[in-house]
Amino acid sequence: EMTAATLYATGRTLAGIQIYENMRCADYLQSRSDVDSGNLAITGTSGGGNQTMYAGALEDRFKAVIPVCSVGNYQAYLGVACCMCELLPGALSFTEEWGVLGLVAPRGLMVINATQDGIQFSVAEAKKSLAGAQVVFRQFGKPENIKHVVVESKHDYNQPMREAMYGWVTLHLKGEGDGSPITEPPMETVDRDLLRCFRQGDRPAGFQTVPMLAKRFATQMVRKQLKPLHKEHWEAQRVAKLGMIRRYVGKHSGRVEL
């Protein structure tokens, strides 16, 4: 959480970087000759589910979007401690979570929730968001392209959840089946080292951690800041600075309107 917080002073968020990376993954997949570049899907669970929701909303190359154990609604976030990578600053000033889900329309959206998950990702809270998003899908004439799947489970991405995803992806990417779950064949997971982009100790010399990236952003921004040359110059800066501070700390600077 402290790592994510290092970005805030630069006006960036960890969620933004993660979502950008998902979109760059789409670029990479479309560059490969062994990938059907017109048929991409995105899925993930928990924080990966949030990335799925936002990347799916922003990137229409994803024809099927399946967030897992992540959809609830923003108001439910207010009563619990959530990961900073899942938070969209100021979101409630312009939308609830249903509005983000609605941006996926009319593409295929399947939301998967677990019955024993935290309140912010609970079935009840997700249903509130699904209800709003369903209105948008109906306006596109595609009510069948949004589906809610509830699995008796804790916070997970287990086999029943994956099987639901397989059916949805098969329908929306291949045009086969009716979206019903597809049985997962027996499989063995590969060794984690085989999934590394770089072997242990073999990262490029120029790699950057999030704090390093934040420092780079900050250094670039500070270099562009000018000290006032005269009083009139300062008065112009003063108005601009006050406007920006009020934007971020609130118009009433600590007063709460009841």
PLM region spans:
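Conserved hydrolase catalytic core segment
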Residues: 57-64
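Cap/lid segment of the alpha/beta-hydrolase catalytic domain
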Residues: 1-26, 30-31, 71-86
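A short, hydrophobic beta-strand element of the alpha/beta-hydrolase
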Residues: 66-68
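Alpha/beta-hydrolase-fold serine-hydrolase catalytic core, especially in secreted/extracellular enzymes
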Residues: 99, 105, 109-258
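Short beta-alpha connecting loops at secondary-structure transitions
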Residues: 7-11, 84-93, 114-121, 148-153
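Alpha-helical scaffolding within the catalytic cores
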Residues: 50, 88-101, 132-134
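Glycine-rich nucleophile elbow surrounding the catalytic serine of serine-hydrolase chemistry
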Residues: 44-56
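Alpha/beta-hydrolase fold nucleophile elbow
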Residues: 29, 34-46
